[in-house]
From Swiss-Prot:
InterPro entries xrefs: Allene_oxi_cyc_Dirigent (IPR044859), Dirigent (IPR004265)
Record GO cellular component, one term: apoplast
Subunit structure: Homodimer.
Role: Dirigent proteins impart stereoselectivity on the phenoxy radical-coupling reaction, yielding optically active lignans from two molecules of coniferyl alcohol in the biosynthesis of lignans, flavonolignans, and alkaloids and thus plays a central role in plant secondary metabolism.
Coiled coil residues, start to end: none
Name by which UniProt lists this protein: Dirigent protein 1
């Protein structure tokens, strides 16, 4: 028994010495009081351009055909799409939609969207919102969750209501109404 204790003594001493020598760091900030949340409604147009000499979205991957339908299941697109005040591509740019979308349904045209909407003009210049969700592009009513943000939209939550404004070939203009609590 004493022999066993002598073997364990260096191990126990090392553990005790390590526990004493390790320090933890923690700070506590005093409560500053209740800060009321803001509610913001944003309205802009999203321009997804796949065709032409200067596309804003490009295909980076495509799965082998898995269905006889022409749905393009498994296509992944990367985008840096302009966000503008009006539906015309030459209207004032207010930001960029940077992220990716993937065709994730075998029987319908449905995209899973993963985007940061980066605002480059106006009151929210430099701020972003993070949008993630299912986008069934032929549904009349669509809803995408806002899951976070930066700058003025830090800790943001809310939802976006995209509505297809115009489709020409594979290019689309989508009207967005975004409702954010931050």
């Amino acid at each position: 028994m004493a022999k066993r204790f002598l073997l364990l003594l260096p191990l126990l001493s090392s553990i005790l010495l390590l526990a004493v020598s390790v320090t933890a760091y923690s700070t506590t900030t005093p409560y500053q009081g209740y800060k009321p949340e803001k509610f913001t409604h944003l309205h802009f147009y999203f321009h997804d351009v796949i065709s032409g000499d200067k596309p804003t979205a490009v295909k980076v991957a495509e799965a082998r055909p898995t269905t006889t339908l022409n749905v393009k299941f498994g296509v992944i697109m990367i985008a840096d799409d302009p966000l503008t005040e009006g539906p015309d591509p030459s209207s004032k740019e207010v930001g960029r939609a940077q992220g990716m979308y993937a065709s994730t349904a075998m029987k319908d045209i449905v995209f899973t969207m993963v985007f940061n909407y980066v605002f480059t003009a106006g009151e929210f210049n430099g701020s972003t919102i993070a949008v993630y969700g299912r986008n069934d592009i032929f549904s009349k009513v669509r809803e995408l969750p806002i899951i976070g943000g930066t700058g003025a939209f830090r800790f943001a939550r809310g939802y976006a209501l995209p509505k297809t404004y115009k489709i020409v070939g594979l290019d689309a203009v989508v009207e967005y109404n975004v409702f954010i609590w931050h």
